[in-house]
């Protein structure tokens, strides 16, 4: 089972998740309380995983119609849902796992986490906003730009 399927398996009993061939070009996914989560049928596997995480973020964190992103409150709710998605499928532990497996390039990390590069970059931007340039986590120093991970014991502090 791939990561997209695992995420579907975790949530399908709580919210309907449908791949829809009729979605307009340019709309990757949408969550509504009536239809659940609709995903555009023209996505790649990694796009499905990335978009589903954000749409589940909407399910978990927002209510009501927030389509009009010129409304500041709606924009804030969109950001909250995206951040929820980042934390759901790209945890600091996942970045450390990549490091431990010698998965170091953006392409390799995205392939391993089954996400698109834009999702990873936006996630790292969010983590930089949350933690700053780097963060000590568990037994590691995670440098967020450019992404690099080091064991604390290997650092000359």
Question: What is each of the regions a protein language model found here?
Answer:
Residues 1-51, 56-157:
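Active-site hotspot residues in diverse enzymes, especially metal/ion-binding acidic/histidine motifs
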């Amino acid at each position: 089972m791939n990561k997209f399927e695992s995420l579907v398996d975790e949530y399908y009993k709580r919210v309907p998740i449908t791949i829809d061939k009729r979605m307009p070009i340019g709309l990757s996914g949408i969550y509504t309380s009536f239809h659940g989560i609709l995903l555009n049928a023209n996505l790649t596997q990694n796009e499905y995983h990335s978009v589903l995480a954000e749409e589940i973020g909407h399910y978990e964190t927002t209510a009501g119609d927030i389509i009009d992103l010129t409304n500041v409150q709606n924009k804030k709710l969109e950001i909250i849902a995206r951040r929820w998605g980042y934390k759901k499928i790209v945890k600091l532990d996942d970045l450390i796992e990549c490091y431990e497996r010698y998965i170091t390039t953006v392409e390799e990390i995205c392939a391993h986490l089954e996400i698109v590069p834009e999702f990873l970059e936006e996630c790292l931007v969010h983590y930089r906003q949350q933690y700053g340039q780097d963060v000590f986590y568990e037994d590691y120093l995670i440098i967020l730009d450019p992404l690099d991970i080091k064991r604390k014991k290997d650092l000359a502090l």
